């Protein structure tokens, strides 16, 4: 069910990050060097989740693994226990909550018309449903964290925090962001571009789908213009 996936990605997954923030406040303040294994594990987990995304053929699985990779960055930022890290982690949780939920919604829109979630079988929608393709492009650009979105602000804060803590982490972060951009563009091109299947009786998009996407992306864009609301 699509509603379950949207709630899971947008809210329940972020409760784990919220729990870590709360636990860090009651733990005695220790040197972050003690948390080095956990930070490396979080970043390495983010890279592995991104690599798993690259080899996914199922649209829904790809979006789910994408959420896991972003949570790796959140965990690493929280564990460092700096103000910038906490701000970046909270901003990324909110931004990715909107983005991943929107992507799940779009995946369901595609599934209702093609009855398949295999990437290569859902291609050619840019000719049939240009508005849906526009929503896909916007959601993927936010997933990549292009400026001036909140995703970009939050990832910049997390990157600054990790680089200030240990400059070597920029290699892992850079690799993670490169793979994120790769699979996001791959997902967009595979599901929207290419030749349109013959004898395709596709019903047009409904107003409720456009409304749902607007309610996902409009708040995110508005928060992006005034990030001090949450940072």
UniProtKB/Swiss-Prot annotation:
It is an enzyme of class 7 (translocase). Its main location: mitochondrion. It holds the Pfam family Proton_antipo_M. Belongs to the complex I subunit 4 family. The chain crosses the membrane at residues 1-21, 34-54, 61-80, 84-106, 128-148, 169-189. Its EC number is 7.1.1.2. It is found in: Mitochondrion membrane. It is a multi-pass membrane protein. It comes from the Eukaryota. GO terms for cellular component: mitochondrial membrane. This is NADH-ubiquinone oxidoreductase chain 4. Core subunit of the mitochondrial membrane respiratory chain NADH dehydrogenase (Complex I) that is believed to belong to the minimal assembly required for catalysis. Complex I functions in the transfer of electrons from NADH to the respiratory chain. The immediate electron acceptor for the enzyme is believed to be ubiquinone. GO terms for biological process: ATP synthesis coupled electron transport; electron transport coupled proton transport. The keyword Transmembrane applies. It comes from Metlapilcoatlus nummifer. GO terms for molecular function: NADH dehydrogenase (ubiquinone) activity; ubiquinone binding. It catalyses: a ubiquinone + NADH + 5 H(+)(in) = a ubiquinol + NAD(+) + 4 H(+)(out). Keywords: Electron transport, Membrane, Mitochondrion, NAD, Respiratory chain, Translocase, Transmembrane, Transmembrane helix, Transport, Ubiquinone.
């Amino acid at each position: 069910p699509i509603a379950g996936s949207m709630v899971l990605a947008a809210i329940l997954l972020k409760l784990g990050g919220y729990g870590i923030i709360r636990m860090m406040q009651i733990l005695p303040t220790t040197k972050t060097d003690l948390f080095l294994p956990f930070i490396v594990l979080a970043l390495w987990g983010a890279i592995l989740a991104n690599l798993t995304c690259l080899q996914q053929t199922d649209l829904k699985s790809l979006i789910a693994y994408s959420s896991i990779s972003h949570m790796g960055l959140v965990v690493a930022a929280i564990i460092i226990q700096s103000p910038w890290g906490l701000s970046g982690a909270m901003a990324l949780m909110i931004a990715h909550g909107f983005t991943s939920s929107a992507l799940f919604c779009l995946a369901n829109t595609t599934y209702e018309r093609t009855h398949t979630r295999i990437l290569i079988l859902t291609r050619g929608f840019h000719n049939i449903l240009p508005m849906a393709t526009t929503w896909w492009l916007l959601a993927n650009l936010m997933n990549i964290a292009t400026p001036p979105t909140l995703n970009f602000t939050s990832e910049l804060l997390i990157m600054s925090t990790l680089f200030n803590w240990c400059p070597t982490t920029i290699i892992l972060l850079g690799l993670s962001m490169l793979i994120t951009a790769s699979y996001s563009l791959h997902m967009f091109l595979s599901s929207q571009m290419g030749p349109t299947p013959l004898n395709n009786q596709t019903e047009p998009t409904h107003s409720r789908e456009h409304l749902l996407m607007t309610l996902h992306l409009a708040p995110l864009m508005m928060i992006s213009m005034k990030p001090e609301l949450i940072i």
